[in-house]
A protein has these predicted regions:
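A conserved segment at the C-terminal end of the G1
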Residues: 19-30
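PAPS-dependent sulfation machinery
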Residues: 36-123, 171-185
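Conserved catalytic segments around the Walker B and adjacent sensor/switch elements
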Residues: 32-35, 221
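Extreme N-terminal, non-catalytic leader segments
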Residues: 1-7
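PAPS-dependent sulfotransferase catalytic domain
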Residues: 87-91, 95, 111-225
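Phosphate/oxyanion-binding loops and surfaces in catalytic or ligand/nucleic-acid-binding neighborhoods
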Residues: 28, 34, 56-57, 161-165, ...
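The Walker A (P-loop) glycine that initiates the GxxxxGKT/S ATP-binding motif of P-loop NTPases
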Residues: 11-12
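Walker A (P-loop) phosphate-binding loop of P-loop NTPases
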Residues: 15
Length: 225
């Protein structure tokens, strides 16, 4: 396998601390990543060349967090330009969702981002459904880092953002129909929004854990905090 076939994906439930971890590791001199420019202009891969300035001492310290300086991004617009259902699927994405066209698109995207950024490894973050089967079909040697934040902290965080889909109830969110067990837990908590956010956390943590069995333990790391 060549270096383009071994990307690393940092994954979690959402509101789980993916960004702080990526802030710590993504600026390693060997790592390339999709930036806000790749997300805004998905087909202009040459914009990854801009990310090279992060390696300059001045931009890697004093100006690192200015808006115009390239930074890692949950680049859903980029991924969605390669597979229309990537951003907000109602279920997880699996091996059977990948056809040859999709596979070639994702491989090309990773290869070009690495090429223009001039790095030997690729890392990216995304949240929600695991998408492990999907990416494992495209990149058979890819690795995953699963960030599990305390469910109480995640539930509290979800209840403090306006865009959480749980505000509109379980029939408008993306995490499927609740099992009888989970529905009764929610019901017994007076249909609490906090309880529903905790249930969302449980659904997604279990989804990622279950699908992690697709890959070997050497390619899957879990970090809890």
């Amino acid at each position: 396998m060549d270096k383009f076939s071994k990307p690393t994906f940092v994954i979690g439930t959402g509101r789980s601390g993916l960004t702080p971890l990526m802030d710590l590791i993504s600026y390693h001199p060997d790592l390339s990543w999709p930036s806000q420019y790749n997300n805004k202009f998905p087909n202009k891969y040459y914009l990854s060349y801009l990310s090279r300035i992060v390696g300059l001492p001045l931009f890697n310290s004093k100006f690192k967090f200015l808006n115009f300086v390239p930074t890692h991004s949950e680049s859903y617009d980029l991924w969605n330009s390669l597979f229309n259902g990537f951003r907000r699927p109602f279920r997880d994405l699996y091996k059977f969702d990948v056809d040859s066209i999709t596979k070639n698109k994702f491989k090309k995207a990773v290869q070009l981002i690495m090429k223009y950024q001039g790095k030997d490894h690729f890392i990216a973050e995304y949240s929600g459904w695991s998408r492990i089967g999907f990416f494992n079909e495209i990149f058979p040697e890819c690795k995953f880092i699963h960030i599990i934040r305390d469910g109480r902290a995640v539930a509290n965080s979800l209840n403090n953002v306006y865009y959480w889909l749980g505000w509109e109830g379980i029939y408008k969110w993306r995490w499927g129909i609740l099992s009888d067990e989970l529905f009764n837990i929610w019901k017994n908590n007076n249909y609490s929004f906090v309880a529903l956010a905790a249930i969302q956390w449980k659904i997604l943590v279990n989804n990622i854990a279950d699908n992690s069995k697709i890959v070997s333990s050497k390619r899957f790391l879990t970090i809890r905090y």
